[in-house]
Amino acid sequence: LKAVGLENHEVLKQFNIRFENFNSATSYSGPAALRLLKSVCGQPSHEDLYEGRNPDCEIMNRLARLGYNQHVFMDHSGKYDNFYQSLRHLAGLSPQLAEMKYPKRYDSFDEEPIGDARAVFKDYENTIAADKGGRSATFINMIALHDGNRFANKRRLAPFKPRAQAMLDDLGSLITDLEKSGRKVMLVVVPEHGAAEKGDKVQVAHLRDIPSPAITHVPALVKFIGVTPADSPVAVDTKTSYLAVSSLIGRVLETNYFGKPEGEVPLKDLVKDLPQTHSVSENANAKVVNYKGKDYVKMDNKDWREYAK
């Protein structure tokens, strides 16, 4: 976002909680989604992500036990790299994903149509409205910002900036609609990883083989809809990752946060001492850690070396 001048987009100012040092722990979509959905038990190694299920670690299933109906929406089919099925088999995501029915906004690098984000959000809004007041937990995955996307039915690649602008605008429209609906919603936004719009001495722009800090340092955000916190916004400056997100969701439930118009407890108390996670990132063939203020990388079975910026 900084690379294309969108780090101060108006919608980002509407969020109540901003994780300033959030680590996505990977630079690819599949493991990022698995890490989020399996976040209750902390950060496993890349290999352990694919070692089967532990329902106690799965945030959606933990919420289902409490009576929350599960929903899932995507702006794509979920078929590439067996994405959706891996979330079902490895993270217990139970809802069936409907056929991609949205107006096409982009074409992905593999010719798959990518649906219009606004239409996806509208489908979500209509679905939860039909719940007639029931509680729900929804997982939405969007690939509109993925590298290699083209404008619909065009050969030309779609630059990151107009796609990011459109996504942020659509996110703002979603927030507006939810506020008008009168529903109480905790909206959590966690980017899978950065877009690598700028390269460095190790990787050229758009290359994500190594999960460098420039790629894994992402703006995780939380917006409470249906309450007006008096001390908003607050920033979480400590090193965090997915465990902090699932822990925050737990605190919202434990405190009955939506019980008062201004929130049951101050935001600063809600985020106080959230679990910290040291900056460790992994892909299948690369690991990156921060140690004593410096970043180090390990490729395959080679020795650790300092990451040149």
Please provide the spans of the model-predicted regions.
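Active-site-proximal alpha/beta segments of enzymes that process anionic O-linked groups
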Residues: 1-151, 242, 251-253, 262-265
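Residues that flank catalytic or metal-binding motifs in active/ligand-binding sites
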Residues: 32, 214-218, 241
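Membrane-interface soluble catalytic domains
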Residues: 56-57, 61, 65, 78-82, ...
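A long, amphipathic alpha-helix that forms part
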Residues: 5, 115-132, 150-190, 197, ...
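Histidine-centered active-site microenvironments of extracellular/periplasmic hydrolases
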Residues: 179-184, 190-228
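Short acidic, glycine/proline-rich loop/turn micro-motifs
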Residues: 41, 149-157, 200-203, 230-234
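Polyampholytic, low-complexity intrinsically disordered segments
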Residues: 144, 162, 172, 286-288
